[in-house]
Amino acid sequence: MSPQTETKAGVGFKAGVKEYKLTYYTPEYETKDTDILAAFRVTPQPGVPPEERGAAVAAESSTGTWTTVWTDGLTSLDRYKGRCYHIEPVPGEEDQFIAYVAYPLDLFEEGSVTNMFTSIVGNVFGFKALRALRLEDLRIPVAYVKTFQGPPHGIQVERDKLNKYGRPLLGCTIKPKLGLSAKNYGRAVYECLRGGLDFTKDDENVNSQPFMRWRDRFLFCAEAIYKSQAETGEIKGHYLNATAGTCEEMIKRAVFARELGVPIVMHDYLTGGFTANTSLSHYCRDNGLLLHIHRAMHAVIDRQKNHGMHFRVLAKALRMSGGDHIHSGTVVGKLEGERDITLGFVDLLRDDYIEKDRSRGIYFTQDWVSLPGVLPVASRGIHVWHMPALTEIFGDDSVLQFGGGTLGHPWGNAPGAVANRVALEACVKARNEGRDLAAEGGEIIREACKWSP
């Protein structure tokens, strides 16, 4: 071997497995305004120190691997590595802790939720040194927020388009969700809109099945919209689900909706994917369409307490990717603690600036600067007797989305819609007059029934 190519044992670095905390646990680190901050709930394997597990999360979700590699010398790890900068125990849990990780902004592609999630949660959740891992919250820095378009239009522009102010918007999901012909589907849409609803909705799994192809559904729903608008003098809409097997097909359906002149389309953003959702959001802004977002599949990700991601993270990601509405669930009949947590991420959807508040599950102060807000959609098992609570809890900037609570009315679809509208207007009027909706809600609804046709 020539002297030029001879490898000397004393040259290079010491290979082998090294503790992550030696490089990635930095409690002295002061976070920067440009860092993306993450709060992970960590459940480690027995016998592993919290500092090592927190550092492992930071390493495996940024620049690290299980050993030192020679190409580490070709870059600046101090500039690009994630850092576990704080660890705190989870109250009431002996084997869990919250690891706070800071990521330099240069690790992420501008305007890409897909890349952000691929980096932060794409690999580390399968790490065998952890029993479970949950991403509880993210702080998105202003510098990164400004690289996103966000919702196509936002709350105020939507109200201006619809010319509807001072109350929540009313919607209804057409049931049965599967099996209706396009013509019968359009009939149900017309009856609900004519009865007083602002919107009707495709169910999340209505795409283009053999019993009802998408183009037929779009045509009959557009007819229902225009007929109900002519008869009521109000602007109406139906969430036409543009979700499809390819991005190209999705955009084709959105183009057809625009050509029909309808005001809004819909997308299943988790099953459809963030890249598809961002593409559709950009199309909707460029072409004047509102965008309703359904969160189908969210419980696969957010239901487990110890593993996955909290919905507040998915809600923040949606605001960045783009959507004018998103289903947020409802707190009616739930525990008070769940109510506070739900309203925490509802505020993250609507407000420009949200202070850190751990009692509501908000781990970081979030500044959205000028990014438009998203209307939360309260849905799932609600009916007119929930209207006082829904009006009080969600306020005016929301969509109250019924299904069986409209279509299950014993007199039919249109009377069900009338009941929804009468109950809502009665509750809004009572609230504006200073009445206590929590205490007097039932009486308010019964009074309204006397005057409802």
From Swiss-Prot:
Its post-translational modification remark reads: The disulfide bond which can form in the large chain dimeric partners within the hexadecamer appears to be associated with oxidative stress and protein turnover.
The record's subcellular location field reads: Plastid, Chloroplast
Q: Which residues carry this modification: N6-carboxylysine?
A: 201
Q: What is its main location?
A: plastid
Q: Which residues carry this modification: N-acetylproline?
A: 3
User: What residues bind substrate, as annotated?
Assistant: 123, 173, 177, 295, 327, 379
Propeptide ranges, please? 1-2
Q: Which Pfam families match?
A: RuBisCO_large (PF00016), RuBisCO_large_N (PF02788)
- PTM sites of type N6,N6,N6-trimethyllysine: 14
Site Transition state stabilizer — annotated at 334
Its annotated function is as follows: RuBisCO catalyzes two reactions: the carboxylation of D-ribulose 1,5-bisphosphate, the primary event in carbon dioxide fixation, as well as the oxidative fragmentation of the pentose substrate in the photorespiration process. Both reactions occur simultaneously and in competition at the same active site.
Tell me its family.
Belongs to the RuBisCO large chain family. Type I subfamily.
Q: What protein name applies here?
A: Ribulose bisphosphate carboxylase large chain
The source organism is Galium palustre (Common marsh bedstraw)
